[in-house]
Each structure stands twice: as C-alpha cells, then as structure tokens.
Amino acid sequence: MVEYRQVVELLGGSAGIGRGVKTLADLDAAINAGLPRSALDHVLEFAAPAAERAKLRNRVVPRASYQRRRRLSPMHSATTERLARVAAMARWIWEDDERARAFLWRPHPELRGRRPIDAALTELGAREVEEVLQRGVHGLPV
C-alpha cells in the first residue's frame, strides 16, 4: 500500500514541501498552511508529459494565482496532494514510472472514459481511481 512517504517524495520531499514531514499529520499541516509552488511542479514533473504540464498545472491552480503567489492555497495544495497520492499509487502498482504515467493519461472504461489524471482532480474522482488501482493489488485487470 502507498504510504505518505511516497506521496511526500513526489511532492519533492521535505525540501519541496518547505518543511520536515515525518508523519501524516505533518503532511496535513503543510497542506493546510499551503504547499510551495515547487511541490506542484515536482508532481507534474513525474506525472505529466512535458507538453501537458502547463495545461494540467492551470487546471490545478489558475495561471495568474500560480504566477502571483509563492504558496498554493490550502484547496490547491489538497488537489496537488491528491495528484501525488494517485501517481504514487500507480507507481507502486506498476513498479515502473513509464507504465504508471501511461495509466494516468489513458482514458479508462471504469472511469467513464475519463483519464485517471483528470478524475484525480476531485476527491471523489481520486477515490474512483484508487478503487481501480486497488484491483491491480488483487491481481484483477486495471
């Protein structure tokens, strides 16, 4: 199962988050305080092809807000963590970064034809993606 440490790694580690994160409560506090923009950049570097990063970033946080602020709002930080969590879970299931990325960007029939990366932008969508990925843990087709 994916641990918070794997999520923290995709957020850029303690340096990317801007504070030490030794527990899930520390990660929650960092999200509520607002993650630095670099945390989103780290997630996108892993999860998105270079040509798609700016578009996905602008779906997480409006372009003007991203350029104006050094820290994300708690709401945008939560979305960033959600993307990192889903990406970390895909990485854990496939044990291969390229295959994990391919899963995130390919429309999936169990997500009503949506791409997992798009579904993960909302809390309920992320839960759906996690359910699909959980099937892979049990050897079912993903």
Predicted segments, located by residue:
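Non-transmembrane "mature" sequence context
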Residues: M1-V142
